[in-house]
């Protein structure tokens, strides 16, 4: 019987001898290379251009390799005290990495390559060092007490972290663009029968076009069939909420998280959804602005289900960067200082990413940090050379370009410049942009699709140029609310976007309209022009029944405080514009303010 007991117990002892080294090694490397990166990812999902699942195989492989090497080293130690101490110390390191990454998180600032002011964090360094020394000393000198709990302690720590990461993932914002890939082959493919094109020139303020028109009346001739809506308002002071307003007609008011608003509005009676349902081929550009857009195969024609790409160079680069950040997060301050240089070199390269291909790069200098990116010039050259009439169904295109957004990139002759962001310099770039636009019109004409196209050339918002003294030839007195002073809108020029619209088959020199319109009217204008029924809010810009004092809504916030990785916007203040939008006298606050996630409050009560 004794022999039988020996036979049955030896394998158990053998498994126990391997179990603890494997468990503590796996716990340590999973903590640093999988769970810490997972917490970073799901705490900042809006910053990562791919799914965590695409990086997880590489993270897991690195953790597995490290676990094999470390557990092999522990197993190779002599039995008894040496192995006992080794297991205890590794378990202590795993515990410390977990504590550091979850409880000893100090605010060192944004990891964007800027130096960290360690001197102001000396107390944090002292706390880190004290805790690490205390735990490691306990693991080293109290190994006989730590070793018996190392196996189950490691298992428990793995389970706790896996559960915590899963919970964080379930609560994190979903970056919809990570789920899809995009077919760019139809970027400039048009229909011979019918096209709807919205061309957004970022920040192109309406009065700049008025000045271009005053100086060169010939613009009205080559903009054949267009109507210039001078009395237009935007909805917001920056791009993010303006794109949904243009494509859905709906205003974001902080009632729900911004990404939830974008997804729900695009999926319910948005212009892309309506046209896709009507058998239009729907294409978006530029996906650099993805936080303000939503697309899936039911809304956009160039969206494809994504094939995971964990093995490509892009995934390897992001996975390695995430592992470095996970290690940085898991180390005490002394270790962080050693890694600071590597982190400073790595994080800027991850800040702007071309993971979705050329079409996601902004029409400006952000791409790869290149301050001389050609932007709109490259777009129009590509459009001129690549456009074709190959679409068998009606086509809808949304192109969002750099316009006159800061920094300014070229002059009126399309030569690259580095100049201050002033009104005069912006006007020079505007002249160059309209040279490009003329070529765009000529291309559509040569393709024999100009007459068959509904074209909108608009801005998403204005800016705060000073002085703001637009030169108006004449303003209907019904569009004034008081006085006869020159038009001045120094406080509200952000809400004055360019709006040019050419209906299908419209001809003749460009005309000027002072009808009270808004960017939120674009969906209804398009569907009305196409003879389609739509649930979009707003009015058709060509409706002759628009009242001269029609109120239009504008929501203002401090754009400098807006971060698209945040769930909500800064507080929004509501205005109503009831007369000609270029006059301060036409702008009135309603007293309503929209705070993040709260019902609106009325400050006038």
Where are these regions (language model features)?
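Catalytic domains that recognize anionic headgroups
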Residues: 3-605
């Amino acid at each position: 019987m004794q022999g039988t007991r020996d036979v049955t117990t030896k394998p158990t002892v053998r498994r126990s001898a391997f179990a603890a080294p494997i468990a503590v090694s796996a716990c340590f490397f999973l903590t640093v290379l999988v769970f810490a990166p997972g917490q970073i990812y799901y705490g900042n999902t809006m910053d990562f251009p791919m799914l965590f699942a695409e990086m997880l195989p590489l993270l897991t492989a690195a953790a597995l390799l490290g676990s094999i090497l470390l557990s092999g080293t522990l197993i190779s130690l002599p039995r008894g005290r040496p192995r006992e101490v080794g297991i205890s110390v590794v378990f202590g390191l795993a515990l410390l990495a977990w504590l550091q990454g979850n409880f000893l998180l100090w605010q060192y600032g944004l990891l964007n390559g800027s130096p960290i002011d360690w001197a102001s964090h000396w107390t944090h360094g002292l706390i880190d060092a004290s805790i690490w020394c205390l735990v490691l000393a306990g693991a080293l000198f109290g190994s006989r007490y730590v070793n018996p709990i190392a196996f189950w302690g490691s298992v428990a720590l793995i389970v706790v972290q896996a559960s915590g990461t899963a919970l964080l993932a379930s609560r994190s914002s979903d970056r919809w663009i990570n789920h899809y890939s995009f077919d760019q082959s139809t970027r400039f493919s048009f229909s011979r029968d019918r096209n709807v094109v919205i061309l957004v020139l970022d920040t192109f303020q309406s009065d700049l076009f008025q000045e271009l028109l005053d100086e060169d009346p010939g613009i009205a001739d080559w903009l054949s069939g267009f109507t210039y809506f001078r009395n237009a308002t935007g909805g917001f002071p920056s791009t993010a909420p303006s794109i949904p307003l243009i494509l859905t007609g709906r205003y974001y008011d902080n009632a729900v998280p911004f990404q939830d608003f974008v997804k729900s509005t695009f999926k319910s009676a948005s212009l892309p959804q309506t046209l896709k349902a009507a058998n239009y081929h729907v294409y978006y550009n530029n996906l650099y602005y993805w936080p303000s857009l939503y697309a899936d195969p039911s809304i956009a024609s160039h969206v494809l289900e994504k094939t995971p790409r964990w093995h490509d160079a892009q995934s390897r680069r992001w996975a390695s960067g995430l592992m470095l950040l996970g290690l940085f997060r898991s180390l005490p301050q002394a270790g962080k200082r050693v890694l600071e240089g590597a982190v400073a070199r790595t994080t800027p390269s991850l800040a702007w990413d071309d993971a979705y291909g050329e079409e996601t790069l902004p029409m400006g200098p952000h791409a790869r940090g290149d301050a001389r990116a050609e932007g709109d010039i490259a777009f129009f050259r590509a459009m001129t050379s690549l456009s074709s009439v190959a679409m068998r169904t009606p086509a809808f295109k949304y192109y969002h370009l750099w316009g006159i957004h800061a920094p300014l990139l070229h002059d009126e002759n399309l030569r690259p410049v580095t100049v201050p962001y002033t009104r005069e310099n912006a006007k020079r770039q505007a002249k160059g942009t309209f040279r490009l636009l003329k070529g765009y019109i000529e291309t559509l004409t040569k393709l024999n699709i100009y007459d068959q196209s509904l074209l909108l050339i608009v801005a998403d918002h204005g800016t705060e140029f000073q002085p703001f003294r637009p030169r108006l030839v004449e303003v209907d007195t019904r569009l004034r609310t008081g006085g006869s002073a020159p038009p001045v809108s120094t406080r509200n020029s952000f809400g004055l976007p360019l709006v040019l619209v050419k209906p299908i088959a419209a001809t003749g020199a460009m005309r000027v309209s002072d009808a009270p319109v808004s960017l939120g009217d674009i969906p209804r204008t398009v569907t009305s022009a196409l003879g389609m029924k739509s649930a979009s809010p707003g009015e058709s810009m060509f409706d002759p029944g628009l009242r001269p004092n029609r109120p239009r809504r504008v929501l203002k916030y401090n754009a400098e405080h807006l971060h698209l990785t945040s769930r909500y916007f800064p507080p929004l203040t509501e205005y109503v514009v009831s007369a000609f939008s270029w006059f301060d006298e036409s702008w009135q606050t309603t007293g309503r303010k929209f705070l993040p996630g709260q019902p609106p409050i009325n400050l006038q009560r």
